[in-house]
Every structure is written in structure tokens, then in C-alpha cells.
Amino acid sequence: MSSEIVPIAEPIRPADGGLGAAHASVAVPKGGHWWFRLLAFLGPGYMVSVGYMDPGNWATDLAGGSQFGYLLLSVILLSNLMAIVLQGLSARLGIATGLDLAQACRARYPRGINLALWGLCELAIIACDLAEVIGTAIALKLLFGIPLTLGAIITALDVVLVLLLMNRGFRALEAFVMALLLVIFVCFGIQIALAAPPIAAVLAGFIPRAEVVTNPHALYLAIGIIGATVMPHNLYLHSSIVQTRAYPRTDAGRRSALRWAVTDSTVALMFALFINAAILILAAAVFHAQGRTDVQEIEQAHALLAPMLGVGLASTLFAVALLASGVNSTVTATLAGQIVMEGFLRLRLPPWMRRLLTRGIAIVPVVVVTWLYGEAGTARLLVLSQVVLSMQLPFAVIPLVRFVADRGLMGALVAPAWLVRLAWVIALVIVGLNLKLLWEFALG
């Protein structure tokens, strides 16, 4: 990637992005109690948090809990703190400039680099969609006995859901996503209560221990957790959807909006921390505690939960949460895809066409691999999707950090020096760990 940031060569309006009529469509109270302003800003953070608990993260958390107990909870906490910083920067970019990350790249980079960044981001969205197809198909099989191949094809029908929600406005999208997040929260809350993990051991797991880096198997899983935590398309998504709020486009209005937006995303990502930690805690309390350190796949975990906990409801709750996770990811991935395509290319497709195109590309490998290699093949395909996401991540993080440090672009909301330094450290850690993960993957 070129190190030069070129001046804006063409005017870019916020309406050029993927929000359309949703731009500044959510009213923000100008007075009254602070609680009402907070409620007005709640939503984008929860949309973003979906990417931190999608089906692609489940296998890593399950493997970490079953193999190492509560050891890797500290890694989940660390990766979540990294995500909070980067998503805060994404919101800062959108609020300060009125541009999303894709628009900022188009404005500041030459055409060739933009096309490359767009292609890489589209690849990441397809990889994310691949994980959603697999997760949703597995959930349909676990709940209704639908074969994986047929379940993967059925997921194409989610375009109807996306269309219905988009036609009802952006707040309807947010409400739907938050309702399904609540379903996931309740499902795992009940499962954790049934598993009754030792509180002292859980709390101790959040304290970093040397074994995380001295044990090569634990380190490998730790890299996987961190590498899969920050979804590249989330950085594009967040910088766009924070602009749905009708805050005053003045320095004071933007500063206030930034405070509320960061509060929203921080609280939402702590919610995601609970879900990811709950998956690992469940695996540790049920599988690791009883000597089953080999549980790494979603279907395997589902099959073992009921007999090992002695409660049939546990497996059902697990599958319901998985289905909610897959459906939720569908909504946010569709929106991110529109934002990326319209931001980089100024190419606007109808949402149903965009959704069918992306989902169609994702369904084909799932159907083919399931037909040729069975369910074990889909598990490997799920891992591959996370590796593809890891490959794209640096190409979203690095432009973001460079932009928020540019006073000419950000104006009064330029990121402070300490935050920029912290962001570069996080970026280097993520890039380094992803490179190591890719190297390990290449070596088998």
C-alpha cells in the first residue's frame, strides 16, 4: 500500500454512501435528561457487536475452553479491549468527517489502491457470509433435522427478511438485531447457570498467565481468538451507521455525538465480551472439567451438552443462540456490503440483488464441500473463512489509523497522540498475530 495520502480529488457527499435515506434519520433530543440522548445513540454499537459473536468465533471459543479451561479468558478480554479502541476510532472518523471508511479511502488514495482495497473487503464480506451460511445451516440441522446442503440453500431466503427490515427504517433494523442479541444473551445465561462454573476459577481466567505464550497449542488458539475478533467490514460499517443520528454538524455537536457513540459501542462490545466468554466458560465447565478436551466443532458441542449437563434444554438453547447469531450477521453483512460497494465505487445495487449476489457466492462452496467431504469439510471451511478474514484485516486497520491521525482530514476531532500510538500498537499486534496465524495455516 502506498504511504502517500493524496488530496481529495472529487467531492464526496455523505449521501454517496450506503445509508441513503437513513442518513441523519434518527432524531437526537437537544435538551432534557441525558438518558434520552443516550437512548437516541444506542444501536450502531450493537449492530457492530454482531460481528464479534458470529458463528465463525464459536469454534475457536469452544476449542479454547475444552482444551485449556478458563486460561484463554484473558485473551478474549484483551482482544475485546483492542476492538473497543478500533471501533471507537471508526466512529470518530465517521462523525468528524461525515465520511465512512470506504469513502475516505476513495477520497485519499489513488484509484488502483482503492480497487484493491475494495476487492479485499468484498472477499472478507464473502468469507464472513460463508461463516454465517455454515452456522445457520448447522443450526437448522440441529433444531429441525434439515440436511446441511438444503439448510445452506435455505439461507438464501434471508433476502426477504433483509428487505422487510430495510423498508421499515434503520431503527427497525437496530431493534431486530438487538432483540436477537437479547435471545443469545438469555440462551447463554441459562446455559451458564446450568453449568454452574466455579466463580473463582472464572475470575482467575481473566488474569493473564505465562502459559498462554509458553504453551504452543494455547498460543495458537490465542492467536486465533485475537485474529478473528476485529472483523474488517465492521470498521467500514461503524464509520457509516454512526451518521444515522441527526446530531448538529458543528464542532460541539460532533464532540457530543462522539462521546455518545463511543459509549454505545463500548457497552455493546462488553456485551459481546460476555457472549464470547460464555461460550468458552461453557466449554470449560462442561467439557474440560469432565476430561473432554477434544471438543472443537459446533455440532460436537451440541451433541454433548445435553448428556453431560443432564438437561435436554441445554442443547436446544445452544442451537437457538447459533441460529440467532447467523440471522443477525445476515443483516449487518448486507448493510456492510452496500456501504463498501457504494463507498469505494459509487455503485448502488438494490439490497435484494446485493444480498443474493453475496449469499450465492458463499453458498456454492458450502454445498460443494458438504457434498464431497460431509460435515467435517464444513468445519474446515469455517476455519478457512476466518483465515481469509485475517488476511484482509490489516488493509482496513492501517488506513483507519492513518486517517484519524490526519489533522487536515479530521479537524478538531483528530485523535490525540496517545490514542494514535495505542492504535498503532494494536494494529501491529493484530497484523503480527495474523501473519503468524496465516503462516501456521500454510504449514498445516
Swiss-Prot record:
**What gene is behind this protein?**
mntH
How does the protein associate with the membrane?
Multi-pass membrane protein
Q: Which family does it belong to?
A: Belongs to the NRAMP family.
Keywords attached to this Swiss-Prot or TrEMBL record, sorted alphabetically, are: Cell inner membrane, Cell membrane, Ion transport, Membrane, Symport, Transmembrane, Transmembrane helix, Transport
Compartments (UniProt record): Cell inner membrane
The record's annotation in Pfam families points to:
Nramp
Give the NCBIfam families listed for this entry: nramp, Nramp_1, PRK00701.1
Q: What is this protein called?
A: Divalent metal cation transporter MntH
| Residue intervals passing through the bilayer | 31-51, 68-88, 115-135, 146-166, 175-195, 212-232, 267-287, 303-323, 356-376, 381-401, 413-433
Biological processes, Gene Ontology terms: iron ion transmembrane transport; manganese ion transport
What does the record give under GO molecular function?
A: cadmium ion transmembrane transporter activity; manganese ion transmembrane transporter activity; metal ion binding; symporter activity
What function does the entry list?
H(+)-stimulated, divalent metal cation uptake system.
- GO CC annotation: what is one? plasma membrane
Stored InterPro entries = NRAMP_fam
